[in-house]
UniProtKB/Swiss-Prot annotation:
Family: Belongs to the class-I aminoacyl-tRNA synthetase family. TyrS type 1 subfamily.
Domain S4 RNA-binding, residue spans: 359-426
Gene: tyrS
Official protein name in the record: Tyrosine--tRNA ligase
Subcellular location: Cytoplasm
């Protein structure tokens, strides 16, 4: 399968391979047939966040090259929590909570791979289906006997926790490696799965699964890890001042998602294009070269925001994000739909809720903190710096009414070029 050779070369060119077991053997293994691979996603919240995008898209890349992807949702391992490189033990959640999260994450994963009836059609599996059937005696006898505690505590992910003063690691979390390792052995036996992918922090768990599969099934399997995405300024990827960037549009709106990528630093944008899009490496290199000579804002951020928003939220989500962005810039707020404004109310703009049916513009400016005092509010109005729903306000005595609001609910207040507040009439 020449597509596989091209895939591995492409992954390397994109910087998407951190570690790989027996890379030449893996290349040969993948080139001879349609192979089954998997990646695990533990339900630690009711949605995946953008940190999960790299492995999701790599599953998709393998499927495009002719291989069968399995997305494992950790209904069992999610009840325990992966200790890998964590400073402290995770809070344990109830089976009902984790079960609900599993269903939501299963639906999210399904948007990224093709569940057709062909040989390489994707599947979503839940490790509770096989781990939940094991009793304690079977676990200790059939799985635990294959693991050396000496080697387990030498794995860097565990060693850091043991060595950290005041931390330590519980037996519950220490056992996580055995459960994840058993996932690989179980999928190898039931689905002929021969490759596990995951973040570079999963290397210890992946190699544990490779060893267990060899011991239990007498089969050779492989592991490949992906780099953990970092930002050039040292801040955590996927976090903003307002919190985590989620894939679920009810937690992070398509507009806020689009804006996150639009705000990518110049030093990161081309790496992110290689990681998070299906544009070819040559196309990305051309953007990078072209942007070197551009006066003003480079094109890379806009391309990145469009490509990733389309992947996650579809054409409709991208269209609404671009429509909102253009309307806020131009002041043509009449072009916005009620759904667009609901996105702004969710997480796109600072908001102020109003119970009354009318309010003076001066009161609106001070209540929304666009002006620190009535005097300043009047000065801003006098200088032509204030608009409501795209219309300049020239008179400080103007009264805003609910009946004049967009869709009877929203008034977008703008002061200057970039300061906004969304008034929500109750």
């Amino acid at each position: 399968m020449t597509a596989t050779n091209e895939l591995l070369q492409d992954l390397k060119a994109r910087g998407l391979i951190a570690q790989c077991t027996a890379d030449e053997e893996l290349a040969e293994h993948l080139s001879t047939d349609c192979r089954t691979l998997y990646c695990g996603f533990d339900p630690t919240a009711d949605s995946l966040h953008i940190g999960s995008l790299v492995p999701l898209l790599v599953l998709k890349r393998f499927q495009q090259a002719g291989h069968k992807p399995l997305a494992l949702v950790g209904g069992a391992t999610g009840l325990i929590g992966d200790p890998s490189f964590k400073a402290a033990e995770r809070q344990l959640n109830t089976s009902d909570v984790v079960g609900d999260w599993v269903n939501k994450i299963r639906a999210q994963v399904s948007a990224f791979v093709d569940f057709n009836e062909s040989k390489n059609g994707a599947e979503v599996v839940n490790n509770l289906d096989w781990i939940g059937e094991i009793n304690v005696i079977e676990f200790m006898r059939d799985i635990g006997k294959h693991f050396s505690v000496n080697s387990m505590i030498q794995k860097e992910s565990v060693k850091q926790r043991i060595d950290r003063e005041g931390s330590g690691i519980s037996f519950t979390e220490f056992s996580y490696m055995l459960l994840q390792s058993y996932d690989f052995a179980a999928l190898n036996k039931a689905k002929e799965c021969t490759l596990q992918i995951g973040g570079s922090d999963q290397w210890g768990n992946i190699t544990g699964g490779i060893d267990l599969t060899r011991r239990m099934n007498r089969n050779k399997v492989f592991g490949l890890t992906l780099p953990l995405v970092t930002k050039s300024d040292g801040t955590k990827f996927g976090k903003t001042e307002s919190g985590t960037i989620w894939l679920d549009p009810s937690k992070t709106s398509p507009y806020a998602f689009f804006q996150f990528w639009l705000g990518t630093a110049d030093a990161d944008v081309y790496d992110f294009l290689r990681f998070f899009t299906f544009l070819s490496v040559d196309e990305i290199a051309a953007f990078e070269e072209s942007d070197k000579s551009v006066q003003g804002r480079p094109a890379g951020q806009g391309v990145l925001a469009k490509e990733v928003t389309r992947l996650v939220h579809g054409e409709e989500g991208l269209a609404s994000s671009e429509r909102i962005t253009a309307a806020l810039f131009s002041g043509d707020l009449a072009s916005l739909t009620e759904t667009d404004l609901a996105q702004l109310a969710q997480d796109g703009l600072p908001t102020t809720e109003l119970e009354a049916s009318e309010q003076t513009i001066v009161e609106v400016l001070t209540q929304s903190e666009l002006a620190k005092s009535n005097k300043m509010a009047r000065e801003f109005i006098g200088n032509g710096a204030v608009s409501v729903n795209g219309e300049k306000v020239a008179d400080a005595e103007v009264i805003l009414k609910k009946e004049d609001a967009l869709f009877g609910k929203y008034s977008v207040i703008k002061r200057g070029k970039k300061l906004f507040n969304l008034y929500i009439w109750k």
